[in-house]
Amino acid sequence: MSLPKILSVDDSRTMRMMVKRAFRNFQCELFEAADGAEGLAAAIANKPDLIVLDYNMPVMDGVTMLRNMRENAELKRTPVIMLSAEDSNEIISTVARLGVRDYIIKPFEDENLLSKVTRIINLKRKPETDQPPVV
């Protein structure tokens, strides 16, 4: 069984390190990008099983990256968890309409992010024959 591929996209190096720390005991291939443009290129190149995406970034923000992903045949169904310091119903509604699976307010607890990632990865693997859940 191959390890799940996860892409972390955030302009804050500190936040990328926090995501990396959250996954320290989670067996996966973790890729990183510093903005939406880098993130889109990394997603196209690596075909991640899940993307942890920051909402507000320079160059290309999370919503623009998400819209571009939804127009790409290979990425349009890739699950996304959006991270943001913004606690706005308008933002949450916007990204939900774009298919974001979950929305986490920064700063986040490692266990919260990891439980959401584990749930999404396990749901994605369920249709595959006899794939054991990741822990």
List the predicted regions and their residue ranges:
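Receiver (REC) domain active-site loop signature in two-component systems and cognate sites
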Residues: M57
